[in-house]
């Protein structure tokens, strides 16, 4: 349950801080083009079977291209693109912090309500009941958010590589 909020907070931490200059963009794009040519060269394909190593290098190359495009938005609405990048980075931080809170609340509820016999405190059950008494669908909506977060955490944990070193 920790991979989703940690990934979101790290995505905020590793975001592009400012738009890079055109000279930096050209240099980085040239380096990426060289790496791309090395990956697709006929001699390399003959030396190696196009297996796991080449596919992994291709994935890393695609990640680097995406990071470069985020750091240097292009087109007619480059300013808008940069603003959207900044807003998405801030949203990742906010959802990461909220996700961290949900990741702490779920196990705490399991310990307080499920593992202790008799239950020490109704905790989330009481919260959902109180929200339902405030407005009919508020408790149901809060429960749906908790369940959706749990599913997204499981999917994030499944997709997250165990040893993400390049």
Curated annotation (Swiss-Prot):
It is found in: Cell membrane. It comes from the Eukaryota. Keywords: Cell membrane, Membrane, Transmembrane, Transmembrane helix. Coiled coil: none annotated. The chain crosses the membrane at residues 93-113, 135-155. GO terms for cellular component: plasma membrane. Residues 1-92, 156-166 are cytoplasmic. It is a multi-pass membrane protein. Residues 114-134 are extracellular. Homodimer and heterodimers. Belongs to the Casparian strip membrane proteins (CASP) family. This is CASP-like protein SELMODRAFT_416721. It comes from Selaginella moellendorffii.
């Amino acid at each position: 349950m920790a991979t989703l909020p940690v990934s979101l907070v790290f995505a905020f931490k590793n975001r592009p801080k400012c738009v890079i200059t055109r000279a930096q963009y050209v240099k980085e794009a040239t380096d990426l083009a060289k790496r791309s040519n090395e990956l697709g060269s006929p001699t390399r394909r003959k030396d190696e079977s196009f297996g796991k190593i080449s596919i992994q290098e291709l994935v890393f190359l695609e990640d680097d291209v995406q990071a470069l495009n985020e750091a240097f938005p292009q087109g007619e609405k480059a300013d808008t693109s940069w603003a959207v990048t900044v807003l998405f980075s801030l949203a990742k931080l906010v959802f990461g912090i909220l996700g961290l809170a949900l990741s702490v609340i779920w196990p705490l509820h399991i310990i307080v309500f499920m593992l202790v016999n008799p239950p020490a405190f109704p905790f989330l059950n009481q919260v959902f009941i109180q929200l339902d008494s405030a407005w009919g669908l508020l408790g149901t909506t809060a429960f749906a958010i908790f369940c959706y977060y749990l599913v997204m955490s499981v999917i994030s944990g499944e997709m997250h590589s165990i040893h993400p070193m390049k």
